[in-house]
Each structure stands twice: as structure tokens, then as C-alpha cells.
Swiss-Prot record:
Name the record gives this protein: TFIIA-alpha and beta-like factor
UniProt KW DNA-binding keyword: yes
Record's function text: May function as a testis specific transcription factor. Binds DNA in conjunction with GTF2A2 and TBP (the TATA-binding protein) and together with GTF2A2, allows mRNA transcription.
Keywords: DNA-binding, Nucleus, Transcription, Transcription regulation
Intracellular or extracellular location(s): Nucleus
Biased composition (Acidic residues): 411-427
Gene3D superfamilies: 1.10.287.100, Transcription factor IIA (TFIIA), beta-barrel domain
InterPro entries linked: TFIIA_asu/bsu, TFIIA_b-brl
Disulphide-bridged cysteine pairs: none
GO BP terms, alphabetized: cognition; transcription by RNA polymerase II; transcription initiation at RNA polymerase II promoter
Compositional bias (Polar residues): 390-401
Family: Belongs to the TFIIA subunit 1 family.
Induction: Down-regulated in Sertoli cell-only syndrome (SCOS) patients.
Amino acid sequence: MACLNPVPKLYRSVIEDVIEGVRNLFAEEGIEEQVLKDLKQLWETKVLQSKATEDFFRNSIQSPLFTLQLPHSLHQTLQSSTASLVIPAGRTLPSFTTAELGTSNSSANFTFPGYPIHVPAGVTLQTVSGHLYKVNVPIMVTETSGRAGILQHPIQQVFQQLGQPSVIQTSVPQLNPWSLQATTEKSQRIETVLQQPAILPSGPVDRKHLENATSDILVSPGNEHKIVPEALLCHQESSHYISLPGVVFSPQVSQTNSNVESVLSGSASMAQNLHDESLSTSPHGALHQHVTDIQLHILKNRMYGCDSVKQPRNIEEPSNIPVSEKDSNSQVDLSIRVTDDDIGEIIQVDGSGDTSSNEEIGSTRDADENEFLGNIDGGDLKVPEEEADSISNEDSATNSSDNEDPQVNIVEEDPLNSGDDVSEQDVPDLFDTDNVIVCQYDKIHRSKNKWKFYLKDGVMCFGGRDYVFAKAIGDAEW
């Protein structure tokens, strides 16, 4: 059933999808491809160490295999038919048989599990001849992508032969499934091993690389001499172009400003003249003058005691005045007529035909009419004042309401059930269990105290192991 476990395949697909999703982002940021590979390897190692699933690498499409790179000092030691890795806890890994060993090349194939192996300190490599090799520091044999030496350790620190010091290096190339080869390398490769698992370039290499990078960025002396004047010329040209409006066209700008001022002053005077002319010849002014003439004629007819038949004829005479105002001499004619009417009125008031009673009556009526017109004008003026007062009152009311709203919101902003003493420390207790199911459900059926759950597309952690399922049915009593 282990080969049918879909958890490793699911986890690997998730890891690969995430790595492929961020590959372009890493490339845009200028991060090396090796960093992405190390991230993937670290992720897989974390999943393996969590022990949530077994056979994480065993069920992969290409099983990772391991290569043991042995120094020449171990050639004579491994001249035996079999050798095995013996763990102090008692677990013995499958043994391998050495077929042919020579001075330049050695190969040994043996069956080995297809997933990374963590070898703690104290593990010994034992051969049939009786030679023992003890591991001084913990190592892990993992998968590599083509080149050897992903996890390398200092010389004379990884493996130590009891009685004779020796070194062994581990790496992982892609080889045939379910086989492992042990090959020998020259001692010069052993000397390049660093004291940390990660492979880092040496100091001189970094300095050389930095010098190369610097030489790529800097410009040669000749080119620099050539580029700088061009940059200065471009800068001067651009600055000259920018300074043209200030140097060349400054008189024109000032002249334009003076012209604008003259045009503005001329337009202002023209507007004033037009405004005055419009006031003098506007229909409103003519209507006001027309009303004044009508009032004068009415008063004159009343003072002389004219009948109602003669009044329309006297009213018709000034009614033609607005029509005649369309002529160029309308203002002159209007002023002459008003002056004549005023003179005639004064002469007629002082005439012998008038009596004191008529004069008093005329003055009384004139005062009444003026008072009536004044009341009308006053009423017209009072209406906007009342409207303005009401508008100002509404504005003040809205302003006061706006000012009061934040206070109300501040009072109402108290969170609901703020007085409840709910501690978040109680929440983890709900999930303090080894068995957790995260899934979706189709339906839940209950009969009295018996429940039946129809679940789908979930992950279940049971006893520290992860299981995935497409559909599941569970029963419970509660």
C-alpha cells in the first residue's frame, strides 16, 4: 500500500509548482538558479524531517541515487567482497559488494533506499576484513543535480578509520534506479573540500570575480575621455535650449506683458463705457423714467381736477417715450420734457386757480403714494433678508449637526460585547490534538445521537502521519 500512497506525489507537485512559479521572479531579481535549487532541497528536507509522510522520495519518477567518492587511501582498505554501514542503534543498511577496484577507478554497486539518509555521528563503516570507519560529524546523503559534492565536510572529520585516518565524501548524481556506485577520486579533489556543507568560492575567486564585474561596469580611459565631452555637450545643449526663453525672448515677454496690460486697461474702459451706456439706454432705465413721467402727469391731472376721460390721453403721451428712446437724441428729448413738466408744475401750483385745499389734498396724496411705494420697496427688501436668515439658520443647523456627528460616532464606536472577557488563550486548546482533518463536506446526516459525515477533498493528520483523500465517510456518536 506504500506505493499507492498519494501524499508524497501531492507534496512533490505542490513544491514543484511553487518553485516553478517563483522561478521568473528569481530571474528578474538576479538571483542564481542554484539558490532556487537549494530552496527546493531545503523544503523537501523539512517535509522529510516532519515525518508526516514516508517514501517521500521513493515514489518519485526518478529515484535519487548516491555516489560515494573515496580517496586513494581507501583503495587498499576496501579490497574486500562486501562492506556495510552499521548504525549503533542496531539498524543495518543494505550491504554492497565491491566488484573491481583499481588504482584509477573503482566501482561498487549496491541496493540502497531511494530517499535521503541522515547519518548521525557515531555511524561506522565496517568491512568484512574488519576495518572500521567512524563518522565524526552528522552527514546527510541527498539528491544533487549533476555535479558531486553538495554536502561536503572537512578532511579527516567525516569518516575516521579506527587506527588509520581517512576521509569520505558524499554526493548524489542521477544514476540508474536502485543502485549506488562507489568511485575513487584523486586526492587533489579532496583538498578542495570546505569546512561547511554549502559550497562557497574562495577569497581570491571572489576578488577576481569582483574585479571582472568592476571592469565590465567601468569605461576604458579612451572611451571615458570620449564619452564625457559628449555628455557635457549634451548637457550644454539642453541647458542652452532651456535658457532660450529667458535670454532671447525676455524683451518680447516684457513687451507682451505691457501689451496685455494696455489691452486689459482698454477693455476695462470699454467695459465701463458700455456699462454706463447700458445703464442709460437699458430698458430698465427707460421703464423707470417712464414710470416717473406717468406719476408726474397723474399728479398734475389730479391737481387740476381733470376727469377720467382726459387721463388716458395724458398717459398716452409719455407712453410713447420708450419707443422714441431708440433714436440717438432720446436722452435729450427726455430731459427736456421732464424739465418742462417740472417748470409747468411749479407754475401751475403757484397759479391763481389753485386753492389751498387742492394743494393740501395733492400733497397728502403724494405722501400717501410715496409711503405706499416705500412700503412695497421695504417689503421687497425684507423678503430676501428673511430668506437669507432662514438659509443661514439652516447652514448653522447643518454645521452644528456635522459637528455633533463625530461626537455621536465616538460614543457609538465602542465595539459590541466589549465588556466580555474573552481570552485568546482558549483557542489553541480546541486544536490541541494529534488528529486533525481539514476538508470539505458534501452533507451531514444525524439520527438522534448518531452522526454520519460525507467528506471530500481533504487532508487528515492521524498519529503524526498525513493522509489525503478524495472522498471519506465517517460515523460518530455525540
